[in-house]
UniProtKB/Swiss-Prot annotation:
Descriptive protein name: Aspartyl/glutamyl-tRNA(Asn/Gln) amidotransferase subunit B
Quaternary structure, from the entry: Heterotrimer of A, B and C subunits.
Protein function: Allows the formation of correctly charged Asn-tRNA(Asn) or Gln-tRNA(Gln) through the transamidation of misacylated Asp-tRNA(Asn) or Glu-tRNA(Gln) in organisms which lack either or both of asparaginyl-tRNA or glutaminyl-tRNA synthetases. The reaction takes place in the presence of glutamine and ATP through an activated phospho-Asp-tRNA(Asn) or phospho-Glu-tRNA(Gln).
Keyword ATP-binding: yes
UniProt xrefs under PROSITE patterns: GATB
Pfam families: GatB_N, GatB_Yqey
Keywords in alphabetical order: ATP-binding, Ligase, Nucleotide-binding, Protein biosynthesis
UniProt xrefs under PANTHER family: GLUTAMYL-TRNA GLN AMIDOTRANSFERASE SUBUNIT B MITOCHONDRIAL AND PROKARYOTIC PET112-RELATED, GLUTAMYL-TRNA(GLN) AMIDOTRANSFERASE SUBUNIT B, MITOCHONDRIAL
Family statement drawn from the similarity comment of this UniProt entry: Belongs to the GatB/GatE family. GatB subfamily.
Amino acid sequence: MTLVDVRTPDPKRFIPGATGDWEIVIGLEVHAQVLSNSKLFSGASTTFGNAPNSNVSLVDAAMPGMLPVINEECVKQAVRTGLGLKAKINNRSIFDRKNYFYPDLPQGYQISQFKDPIVGEGTITISLGPDRQGNFEDIEIGIERLHLEQDAGKSMHDQHPTMSFVDLNRSGVALMEIVSKPDMRSSDEAKGYLTKLRSIVRYLGTCDGNMDEGSMRADVNVSVRRPGEGFGTRCEIKNVNSIRFVGQAIEYEARRQVAILEDGGVIDQETRLFDPGKGETRSMRSKEDAHDYRYFPDPDLLPLEFDDAFVEALKVDLPELPDDKKARFVADLGLSVYDASILVSEKAIADYYEAVAAGRDAKTAANWVINDLLGALNKFGKDIETTPVSPDQLGGIIDLIKAETISGKIAKDLFEIVWNEGGNPAEIVEARGMKQVTDTGAIEKAVDDIIAANPDQVEKVKAKPTLAGWFVGQVMKATGGKANPQAVQALVKAKLGIEDE
């Protein structure tokens, strides 16, 4: 594969060294576990967390005479992912044997795809920002290829003081290896790319993206160079299992390589691992090249072939993807690019928002989901799937505000009650006497009392009418936040002789 440099050097991406600026070049190889009930070449279950060696067929264990049979659903999932990446779908692809020895690889080789992958070149667009002016920077990252392959088993070294064990539950599970082009120039870009890729496969339903369970992990290729020069020698950091760790690994590895080069040394092409505890990478082994694996077509598998109709049938059923959904939220619902970007970042968040916004003001719904719901989820370490406030409950709170049954301040208190205790918002308001005070007589008395008690403040307002907000706040405080804010403001202005602008 010939690497092509498509990025113009950008000074704001450079990292400073003792002898001048350096540029990082990053490419990612992401292994995404295919969402399917059975493995790539056997009928064994793919359920995560089962007892060791309980999801193993004779094919997975490489028993003599056992032949692989392709799982059609895994093929469909790979094609769906390729379509979601705007990539070329190859109607003919070939499975190869990648030969290497490892205890948890019972066949002595991995069935993968080398020269003829199922998916060719594609693109992902990421957005970085916003900057101080509120602008976003869109960057297009190239996809080199996507191919199907088997996962290996798992070596277990913590079960016995003197022995290691092998769990083959993962052996033969279908993986999509999604290989980017070396188009990223900072850790933020790499994190943005991985975040966007995870979002896309989750929208498509082709991978759950749960990095903590190992169903998505990244091999990170990092090199450094002087701006404008050719590619440097790269090192590959294997099996990084969180987006945050990807960023940390890149930052450390780039600094390590710069220090070596500035000291007059050379970078060895090698495979490294990232130690999250120490925040550093360390050497594992010298980096293999393709010829070291002695690829050749698997004689037990015919070439994988399908026609255009097969692809089109999958294409028509694709869901709306993040970029299209964001564009619709901006164009049809009038949301800002910033708000739309947050809401489409995860399919579950977008689905939640659309349920809340149905039949309601889109911007009001967005404000509540982003500021109140997501803020609370972040504060208490929860995610959208485990939120204690359902879309119906949040929608009910918004309805009560619109009907002027409660004020904005009371709505915040109501949200907290629903979060902690659950329940129907309207019934809670009724039972706890939280309804907004709309009786103008009662509000007028409260305004009169505040004005009478603060003659000095009245004089200040006459000199500076914008200070009238102080009186509004005092009245709201005196009424426990139950007074209608608009009615309070109108009465305060009338009593103080302030004309509307």
